[in-house]
């Protein structure tokens, strides 16, 4: 029987106590610099609407429903209801902001529709329809290209850049089409036009299009870098819209395929992605994970990258307190800033709530024929090699055979093992088997129908292990 994930109590309590605040700083004080944000309120509703019908929270339905109402009502206070403004139907990003971002509409529409499904309050439905059919249409029509203008102020000043992250708006437009059949054609045409323009920039790993120079751009001094969360949100939006398309496969594969460089040997994209990614030089461009990625990508990974899904859950489960913070470092998951982030906790709560142990032909073979090894992920190399704390992993182990090995001086065939694992091992990680330590030398993934099923790794005994 499949083992279901359970949301940590601290995550649930954090959302119930602090949403819609964006950040909470020690000792549990909402950060006044950022205050409340519609992003945090929307993502909290996304989680709570799922928790409302989950067995784990069967006795909490009343308080969850009340919190959903509180958050949805607050989001409505941030919506522009003046039909004479270009921001009409949009949502202020924060309490003190004057900017109404397209992507915030994309975040709020699904949340308001979730709240409508739980409560039956048609005010939430009407607000979502206004955001999709009026505001996003306005943001699309303001420029001639087909995406969505980034933002407009309450004074009708425009930010006309077209962000690929706005592909996330496809989720809300699709949900609107399902519940508002009368206007389904409108929502579909908005979505189709957005995809028609943004797809090429997304496929080529650009962050935004600048109408002023008619060029695509990234960030960084050489414009080589992208934000991981922007691409995660865009991936989820396009995946929801068109499934596991060639575009989704290519973008996910490209970002997931960026491995640990010599400067950051602890980096592991199977856990989550780097906050900044140099997509030209194929390099994590900062020292920390943007852990929200693990939550945003859970649906995609559950369908098409089960090894990464399982490994990310194993790590986040073990270090669940650290992953509530924004920006855990690659080495020990300590935060670069001691602030807990509502968006991160809400998305990781969805991961916990929906997690099911992957069941594949290989995992079933492992269950009967595998043995437990201890994995020590590589953290650093220097005067001495440093590894992380051990993790129990299951694998099938065979002794190396001379025909498939390249021997190094001082080693014999008895010093090598071949490991077949569901866990995505990395070169130079350490494995302990029956008290003997081995270093991973090579890793070869094996796929079925394009999705990785397992890994074959050749490991060499550590003579000083």
Task: Put a short name on every predicted segment.
Residues 338-342, 363-369, 408-414, 449-452:
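Short, surface-exposed loop and linker segments with low hydrophobicity and enrichment for Pro/Ser/Thr
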Residues 358-386:
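Active-site-proximal polar cores
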Residues 380-465:
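Short, conserved turn/kink motifs that form compact alpha/beta structural patches or helix kinks used as
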Residues 25, 101, 287, 329, ...:
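Exposed, low-complexity/repetitive linear segments and helix-based recognition motifs
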Residues 95, 152, 372, 379, ...:
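Solvent-exposed, flexible loop/coil residues
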């Amino acid at each position: 029987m499949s083992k279901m994930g359970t949301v940590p109590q601290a995550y649930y309590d954090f959302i119930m106590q602090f949403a819609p605040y964006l950040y909470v700083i020690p000792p549990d004080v909402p950060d006044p610099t950022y205050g409340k944000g519609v992003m945090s309120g929307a993502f909290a509703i996304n989680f709570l609407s799922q928790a409302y019908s989950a067995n784990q929270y069967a006795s909490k339905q009343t308080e969850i429903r009340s919190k959903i109402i509180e958050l949805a009502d607050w989001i409505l206070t941030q919506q522009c209801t003046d039909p004479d403004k270009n921001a009409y139907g949009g949502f202020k990003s924060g309490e003190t902001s004057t900017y109404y971002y397209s992507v915030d509409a994309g975040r709020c529409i699904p949340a308001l529709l979730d709240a409508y499904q739980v409560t039956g309050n048609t005010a939430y439905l009407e607000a979502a329809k206004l955001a999709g059919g009026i505001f996003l249409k306005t943001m699309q029509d303001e420029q001639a290209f087909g995406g969505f203008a980034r933002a407009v102020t309450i004074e009708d000043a425009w930010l006309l850049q077209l962000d690929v992250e706005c592909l996330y708006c496809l989720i809300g437009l699709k949900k609107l089409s399902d519940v508002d059949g009368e206007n389904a054609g409108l929502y579909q045409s908005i979505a189709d036009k957005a995809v028609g323009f943004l797809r090429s920039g997304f496929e080529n790993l650009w962050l935004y299009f600048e109408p002023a120079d008619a060029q695509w751009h990234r960030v960084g001094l050489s414009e080589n870098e992208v934000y991981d969360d922007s691409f995660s949100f865009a991936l989820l939006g396009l995946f929801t819209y068109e499934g596991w398309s060639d575009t989704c496969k290519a973008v996910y594969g490209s970002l997931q395929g960026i491995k640990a460089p010599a400067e950051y040997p602890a980096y592991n994209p199977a856990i989550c992605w780097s906050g900044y990614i140099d997509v030209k030089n194929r390099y994590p461009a900062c020292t920390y994970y943007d852990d929200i990625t693990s939550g945003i990508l859970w649906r995609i990974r559950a369908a098409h990258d089960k090894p990464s899904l399982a490994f990310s859950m194993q790590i986040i489960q073990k270090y669940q307190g650290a992953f509530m913070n924004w920006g855990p470092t690659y080495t020990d998951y300590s935060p670069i800033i001691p602030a807990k982030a509502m968006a991160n906790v809400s998305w990781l709560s969805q991961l916990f709530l929906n997690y099911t142990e992957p069941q594949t032909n290989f995992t079933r073979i492992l269950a009967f024929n595998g043995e437990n090894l201890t994995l020590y992920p590589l953290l650093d190399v220097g005067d001495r090699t440093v590894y992380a704390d051990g993790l129990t992993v299951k694998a099938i182990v065979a002794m190396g055979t001379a025909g498939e090995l390249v021997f190094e001086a001082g080693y014999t065939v008895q010093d090598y093992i071949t490991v077949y694992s569901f866990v995505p091992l990395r070169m130079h990680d350490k494995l302990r088997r029956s008290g003997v330590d081995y270093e991973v030398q090579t890793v070869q993934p094996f796929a079925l129908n394009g999705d990785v099923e397992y890994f074959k790794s050749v490991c060499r005994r550590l003579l000083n292990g």
